[in-house]
Amino acid sequence: MKVVAMKKIIQLIFVAMLAIGFGSITSAQMSGPTKVVYHIDDAETQGLKGLRNIRNHLDVSPQTTIIVVTHANGVDIMMDGAKDKKNSVEYAPLVGALKSRGVRFEVCEITLKNRNLKKDQFILDTDFTPSGVVRVADLQYKDGFAYIKP
């Protein structure tokens, strides 16, 4: 009898803890403007599409906070003079237009090291982060950002 009562108490405590935890996550996500991290790791398949998605996102919801995190081949959209391979559209003007609307673009420093790239190869005002993958995870988990991968 005592074991059954103890199990019920533990279950009630667990349910209460879950309710409190989910309640705080829900209220954090619902307060303030929407926050979104766009994750780009391949310029060829996600670059132009991602930049257009972000433009459309802001056209519909201009108050949205957007951070674009790039790593691996995704950093190519931030390189000076880089163009979309399919139709030769230059990325820099598109990135610049989005930056003027408040979008932050971050490049993974691990990728720079692995690809022997230098910070001066990137367009002006590029922000850098020690690890793109860690940054995406932190924005989602710690800062409540929604995740979009174009």
Regions picked out by a protein language model, each given a short descriptive name:
Residues 1-2, 26:
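Signal peptide-directed secreted proteins
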Residues 2-3, 147:
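Short hotspots in intrinsically disordered terminal tails
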Residues 3-13:
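Bacterial N-terminal signal peptides that target proteins for export
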Residues 13-21:
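Bacterial N-terminal signal peptides
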